[in-house]
């Protein structure tokens, strides 16, 4: 029995499923999860001494690679002053100024501790501002685990084989309306059926929790126009795309400005953090200046702020990072497609910039229904093969691969070699 297996055996006795987040349990791919001991650059190391090229990157935030010196130094310096004060700090002011400078839709911002918290709070602010209750979300888009949004969600909910979650009362989701991603007609119909009742549309501008499904031409523009026409707010969930597609996120990349946006993961440089923000008149609805209550004891934690600022400042000062990681992503996707052609395989590779996903599906994936056609059993076999050969990808068909500044073309070539070995035995 490996040390990882021993740890998992201990973990299941005291942690539900042996993990603190369901997808880590490897239920959809089989086998025991690897317990990670350390990480550096593009690589992670498990407790049994195995080295992997890492394409999870802590689910996105390690855009510079693991254990980056600039971030590590900032964390150490901040921690030496104190871990948490429960009071206002200069660091959170500087972070807010930096975010409002970089993010196109931000005039004001509120720090929180996770992406889920950011989304919950943004929706509450939207409802308070518009004095409406109904929200439109898209099938297959994942916005965290808050009650009102666990309806046909993506991410781990899709691979768990459950459409929603027990413990969520029907009243919690009665104001959550479902539209089809990349289908403006479904959105138009909801506005017709719920005239003057819709507070906001929330969307992953790139549906990265559904397998990196890209917006069709005109889709995001159409959402912007519909929200403006009907007096609803447009919320971009940029927990995955933020500061990854570009320094200004998906809203900068696609030049579509939402009214509110949510971020997580990456703005903490690897520390637990999130934020939501947008137009001043909306954000001034938030307490203590407005009637929309939202609070957090550890929000704006000084160590997290230091880590986040270090990463964002580095990205701002080094635009070549985006050139490199986007080229790596494009190179990988092109080479995988060449392998599919070589072996006459009809699988799909999707992605944009430094995001990628290999779909074990015969036809192009554009929405929730086509994503569900993917062969998850085939993905499980592929995942185990990759893991056994030193490539660490997300243990779920519908998650993204993340390329970092620490990855090299040699890492990509080594990964492509393993993929080709897998295709040869099919």
From Swiss-Prot:
Coiled coil ranges: none
Q: Where in the cell is it found?
A: Cytoplasm
Which GO MF terms does the UniProt record name? glutamate-1-semialdehyde 2,1-aminomutase activity; pyridoxal phosphate binding; transaminase activity
The prosthetic group or cofactor this protein requires is:
pyridoxal 5'-phosphate
Q: In which pathway does it act?
A: Porphyrin-containing compound metabolism; protoporphyrin-IX biosynthesis; 5-aminolevulinate from L-glutamyl-tRNA(Glu): step 2/2
| GO terms under cellular component | cytoplasm
Show the catalytic activity: (S)-4-amino-5-oxopentanoate = 5-aminolevulinate
Which of UniProt's keywords are assigned here? Cytoplasm, Isomerase, Porphyrin biosynthesis, Pyridoxal phosphate
Q: Name one GO biological process term.
A: protoporphyrinogen IX biosynthetic process
Q: Name a Pfam family for this protein.
A: Aminotran_3
PROSITE patterns to which the protein is assigned, alphabetical: AA_TRANSFER_CLASS_3
Per the record, residues carrying N6-(pyridoxal phosphate)lysine are 265
Per UniProt, the enzyme's principal EC class comes to isomerase
**Carries keyword Lyase?**
no
Q: Which Enzyme Commission number(s) are on file for it?
A: 5.4.3.8
- Principal localization reads cytoplasm
- Family note: Belongs to the class-III pyridoxal-phosphate-dependent aminotransferase family. HemL subfamily.
Q: How does it assemble?
A: Homodimer.
> What HAMAP family does the record point to?
HemL_aminotrans_3
PANTHER family on file: GLUTAMATE-1-SEMIALDEHYDE 2,1-AMINOMUTASE, GLUTAMATE-1-SEMIALDEHYDE 2,1-AMINOMUTASE 1, CHLOROPLASTIC-RELATED
Name it.
Glutamate-1-semialdehyde 2,1-aminomutase 2
Q: Which organism is it from?
A: Lachnoclostridium phytofermentans (strain ATCC 700394 / DSM 18823 / ISDg)
